[in-house]
Amino acid sequence: MVKSVALIGLGGIGMLYDLKLPNSVLSHARAFSEHNSFKLVGAVEPDETLRKVFYKNYNELAYPTLAELFDHCLPDVVVVACPTNLHFTVIDEIFRFYNPQAILCEKPLAYCNEDAEAINNLCRVNGVKLFVNYIRRADPGVLEVKNRLITRDICLPFKAVVWYSKGVLHNGSHFLDLMTFWFGPVQSIKLIDAGPHIGEEDAEPDFHVDFVH
């Protein structure tokens, strides 16, 4: 059964990353529009120029507000790709209109534990599946490593060195999630160096992590 999808936010990951790359799939808009199991039915974007770009490329309307989108359609899946500081506000507003089957939220889910837990609780009490866009969990190679860990073709303990850039929340968290997927929950974290700040909300610390396995 084909699932309908709406996008909240038409910035880089929402639409722009692959706009001039016709042979690449780097955005939610391109990914859902080319997948046979989904139908892109609309979007929300405050920037009028981006709304016009969306319509030109995907032949679907983008609206300035959630209310206008949901007057037009009630999609099965809502993709939250707006700035991180708006994630809680947007998801809370979605539930004021209806309960979608699933919400796919860009990472990081939030900048603080309080907001992240509030988002998780909102989805839980409303019976809506919440996914955070840590795409490596769906990568065939990653799944093969996971299977080999389960079958003990790869034996623990295991040591990994990860280099990342553009912030621990926005990019480094991909690898923390990958390590927990492979090795289990985080047991302890030791800060080695605080590193530089990346904007107001992110940084690039060096740290040591032990995982339960």
Question: Model segments located where?
Answer:
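Short loop/edge segments at beta-strand edges and connector loops
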Residues: 64, 105, 132-134, 190-193
